[in-house]
């Protein structure tokens, strides 16, 4: 029996340049003569407010599935709260209250902290970027470990696929300038999952909440600072309306990937062609959003500065270094008591130990040519 990664490899090239062509080809050949086929509709819900591009990512996926299947499979892409609260979509999918969901696995760290290793992966686990992390998923058994984590470790009736690139992310939004970790002390900040624990080690008081609650909480004085995503997502959520100082980058989500989850019985009930369409659509959506965000984020930064007077500042290196140290401590502590976390972390570290040093040697620093053609200006 083929592994999930082997199945994926047989359909989608590891070259991102070929992925889009493969998806287009699938649309042309995967479904023929389907006019008479019965249409199936899957009801899925995200964890995102309807106004965000995160939800647009979900809708784009649904549109691609419908086209790739010639209209025989449709996805109803509902926003957060339309059926269940945002943080309940995993259990709702497993219990078949909904057929699937669109979110990010670090929301499920309450079930097991290893959930963070399939999504935001603080510090890229050990220095990986988003491409490296996807390499682990597609080429080093990560997808199988993801499915096993949900099905065997958490006893949930779901399958999962990477679909949403959401990094690198900004450090966050603040009411006043910050210079060092000392400035975190006494601040109450919106952070999620294991990242919240890391910032607690650094002196913050942290609270978890869905994105839609951030602005109202800030306006009521419940929180002093917040992290969401950065760029266009923060702009759409309205964060420049309540905070003036925006620091970037962060080190907490520099290899972050959102997920599509589907009830396993629903997945098994799809035809091979419908499953293929979902695989192709998730991969195409991932790549298209990766490149789309580049321009959207650049435009958003400009709008924050010109229309909202946002002070966009580089994060002091000391803060990033202290984050890495705190993350290493928490990862070590968790591995000592959580064999599931240890198994996944060590797999990622083994992959990174080969890829990250080689990539550092082969790739020129992004700033090398960027600074030559576009000399940096102080913000």
Give a label for each model feature:
Residues 2-21:
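Bacterial N-terminal signal peptides that target proteins for export
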Residues 5-7, 36-39:
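General helical secondary-structure elements
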Residues 20, 24-29:
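Hydrophobic core
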Residues 21-22, 38-133, 149-379:
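N-terminal secretory/targeting leader peptides
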Residues 29-37:
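Sec/Tat signal peptide C-region and signal peptidase I cleavage site
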Residues 136:
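A short, highly charged nucleic-acid-interacting micro-segment common to nuclease
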Residues 140-145:
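Core domains of carbohydrate- and sulfate-ester-processing enzymes
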